[in-house]
């Protein structure tokens, strides 16, 4: 719904760094990029950001995107400390939005 007061956190994971995006009512609340080397670093930055924004780990939804799956220790650790963790299936998004990566770049 358009008027959802709930803040949602999206984390886009690459090797060595990740971005945290927080949105509320379809508006960007925060965008930040962090370097990490261990699952503990990764979790620390997520929890630190949540705390700065007054987000309760028992409540806010966390969507993980990118280089991660349910078997990953990064996912496992996040899941242990944050109640609402899910993996966002990007292929699903691409299908729904008809994103095309076959555009001719030449």
Predicted segments, located by residue:
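Hydrophobic/aromatic-enriched cytosolic interaction surfaces used to assemble or bind macromolecules
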Residues: 1-106
């Amino acid at each position: 719904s358009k008027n959802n007061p709930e803040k949602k956190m999206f984390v886009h994971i690459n090797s060595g760094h990740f971005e945290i995006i927080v949105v509320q009512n379809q508006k960007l609340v925060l965008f930040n990029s962090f370097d990490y080397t261990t699952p503990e670093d990764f979790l620390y930055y997520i929890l630190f950001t949540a705390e700065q924004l007054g987000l309760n780990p028992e409540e806010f939804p966390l969507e993980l995107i990118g280089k991660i799956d349910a078997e990953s220790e990064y996912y496992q650790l996040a899941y242990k400390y944050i109640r609402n963790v899910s993996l966002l299936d990007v292929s699903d998004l691409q299908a729904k939005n008809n994103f095309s990566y076959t555009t001719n770049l030449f």
